[in-house]
Amino acid sequence: MFGSLLLGIATLLGAIYAFLVSNFGHWRRRGVTEPRALPLFGSFPNMIWPRQHFTMDMRDIYMHYRNTHSYVGCYLLRAPKLLVLEPRLVYEIYVSAFSHFENNDASKMVDIAKDRLVALNPFVLEGEEWRHQRAVFSTLLTNGRIRTTHAIMQRVCLDLCQFIAIKSAGGKDLDCIDLGLRFTGESLFDCVLGIQARTFTDNPLPVVRQNHEMSAENRGLAIAGAVHGLFPNLPRWLRPKVFPRSHDRFYGQMISEALRLRRSKHQERNDFINHLLEMQRELDLSEEDMASHAMTFMFDGLDTTSNSIAHCLLLLGRNPDCQRRLYEELQLVNPGGYLPDLDALIDLPYLSACFNESLRIYPAGGWASKTCTKEYELRGSHHSEPLKLRPGDHVMVPIYALHNDPDLYPEPDVFRPERFLDGGLKNCKQQGIFLGFGNGPRQCVGMRLGLAMAKAALAAIVQRFEVVVSPRTLNGTELDPLIFVGVHKGGIWLQFVPRKNVTTK
């Protein structure tokens, strides 16, 4: 009896082991070098056992092979992924050969029947549906419509600075991840929904808490990633729900209320929600479709923009000379601490350079994963024969590793905005070494709105306060291994010293 039990356990363990390693060798059989992969953990063990952020696993592989290989075969748990190391090939995948890699792997993780609020988000859509929804959002995000949000951003920036002045009085530390979420939450709710979220008051809508649950505490996202890694070909209807139901209820109710109020008041504002109502009449959209369209702005802008603001403030606080130069640029455009008009703000070269350099050091997404949609020959400089990629093959781009490669960016840990002045941004994007917002036709759909918000917040803060790093903030640029989206480990705690002769009112 005991022997039979042991045999059964051994058989079960053997079957599990065989399942976990069954895909290993997929790339080797196609002539591609494979770094060591472990059962269950795959090539990126810190995704399961997070001693450091798992993008560091990609960076380690990248640094080991970049001078001898253009790509290597890796495994996300047990899902085969081709890790592309050569920047020229990265540019091909994103831009020149885009038609062969037009789908994001995120579409394989999300069941849009379960997560209806992201059902129309271009990031998770494929093929013709992606093209259609991308066109819809292009009409929503015109320069003219973004300009109409500037008055709202001016009001929110004033509230932001008053909040900072009160909460940081006496040299108190401020949690800048929280501060960024308050700003983006207030901005997006008013710009998109016409609702003031009151995030800088003592009685706010629970925007910050809901977003924290969606990102930092979202077990559904981690589970969906693990399921995709273990069962890469799982049918869509078996995929788990990604976003918390509390998140669906909160945003669903807010969006429905915003639509109801706008209809009842018959307001004519040239803003996003007014255009959504026009689209509903023209395209016969359901309330669920309307909510999904509105939620795309929230999903794409809340977390990534707030983190980018916080990281840029951290780096400016660590580099007083850069902060001083940015302050002088802002004063030349609009002395007195008032926010410049949107066109002037967007075009400020040093502000743009500071923001892009912070995105280089702390990219909003540390990696990207694309799906081959048409057969393609990948011709790497380090390989004599091209690799034939087939539809369904997945390629990964190690964005964090590219951004922090000392051969591409000398002294990558040093905050040096000058890298992105005088055509530096265009040059880096064309080389395939800067992917702060992605690149090519599938670059971030909300990029212009996100840039407008981030630059408005940074300009307002730097003109009114000197930013100083608190001793509570850890040195270095290590990412928190427990948060899926890359955030500075230990939080970002800063102090804000009011500048002389500048009002915060």
UniProtKB/Swiss-Prot annotation:
Highest taxon of the lineage: Eukaryota
Membrane topology: Peripheral membrane protein
Cofactor: heme
Record key words, sorted: Endoplasmic reticulum, Heme, Iron, Membrane, Metal-binding, Microsome, Monooxygenase, Oxidoreductase
EC number(s) recorded for this UniProt protein: 1.14.-.-
GO molecular function terms noted in the UniProt entry: heme binding; iron ion binding; monooxygenase activity; oxidoreductase activity, acting on paired donors, with incorporation or reduction of molecular oxygen
Keyword Membrane: yes
Subcellular location field: Endoplasmic reticulum membrane; Microsome membrane
Gene Ontology CC entries for this record: endoplasmic reticulum membrane
Pfam families xrefs: p450
Gene3D superfamilies documented for this protein: Cytochrome P450
Similarity comment: Belongs to the cytochrome P450 family.
Function comment: May be involved in the metabolism of insect hormones and in the breakdown of synthetic insecticides.
Protein name: Probable cytochrome P450 28c1
Organism of this sequence: Drosophila melanogaster
Lineage of the species this protein comes from: Eukaryota, Metazoa, Ecdysozoa, Arthropoda, Hexapoda
Gene coding for it: Cyp28c1
